[in-house]
Amino acid sequence: MPDKPTKEKLMEQLKGGIIVSCQALPGEPLYSETGGIMPLMAKAAQEAGAVGIRANSVRDIKEIQAITDLPIIGIIKKDYPPQEPFITATMIEVDQLAALNIAVIAMDCTKRDRYDGLDIASFIRQVKEKYPNQLLMADISTFDEGLVAHQAGIDFVGTTLSGYTPYSRQEAGPDMALIEALCKAGIAVIAEGKIHSPEEAKKINDLGVAGIVVGGAITRPKEIAERFIEALKS
């Protein structure tokens, strides 16, 4: 297992490349109770030249670590109803991810009510206090959320949840305006969410982001097939 990179070293590694998100949830075609599928996705991503992997769950991350030394952005998706945040939503999930020695832990940093009752700045501070050497990424949906996370000391701000909170932009395609505004504010941005084409990725890269995560457009064959099929119907 490689040593955990510093922020500077990781930014160097991610610059101008694609981080591939390799995830499948229960009910999706590529989900398997016994695992084994996501490391194959990660292997394909590595062979293609990906600079990092984003992965969900302790099991998938461990399996991916066994086949690649690429830096991993790790999350744990777990529902805490009635609250909406489910991406690394409490310290329990942070603890589980921190034990895996991954490059980055990503967590929900939206302004929505949280299961632990904390505001996001307090949660970030608690995580930083407990794991001072762990790089952290805030999954946000608006500029203000990104700013709050940045001011609380987060290392990277991801546009992951734009369009997935009721108060954020709801259009198709990546939130270019949000990505650009965060970059202009001097924040290390990892662009993520609704990036469907190499052309979009190129435009985003030109905005000066720290990294780009592409998931569904690469690793969800059902979603890819649906886009082709819909195109023929329209």
Curated annotation (Swiss-Prot):
SUPFAM superfamilies: Ribulose-phoshate binding barrel. GO terms for molecular function: N-acylglucosamine-6-phosphate 2-epimerase activity. Pathway: Amino-sugar metabolism; N-acetylneuraminate degradation; D-fructose 6-phosphate from N-acetylneuraminate: step 3/5. Pfam families: NanE. Keywords: Carbohydrate metabolism, Isomerase. Its EC number is 5.1.3.9. It comes from the Bacteria. It catalyses: an N-acyl-D-glucosamine 6-phosphate = an N-acyl-D-mannosamine 6-phosphate. GO terms for biological process: carbohydrate metabolic process; N-acetylmannosamine catabolic process; N-acetylneuraminate catabolic process. Converts N-acetylmannosamine-6-phosphate (ManNAc-6-P) to N-acetylglucosamine-6-phosphate (GlcNAc-6-P). Belongs to the NanE family. PANTHER family: N-ACETYLMANNOSAMINE-6-PHOSPHATE 2-EPIMERASE-RELATED. This is Putative N-acetylmannosamine-6-phosphate 2-epimerase. It comes from Streptococcus pyogenes serotype M2 (strain MGAS10270). The gene is nanE.
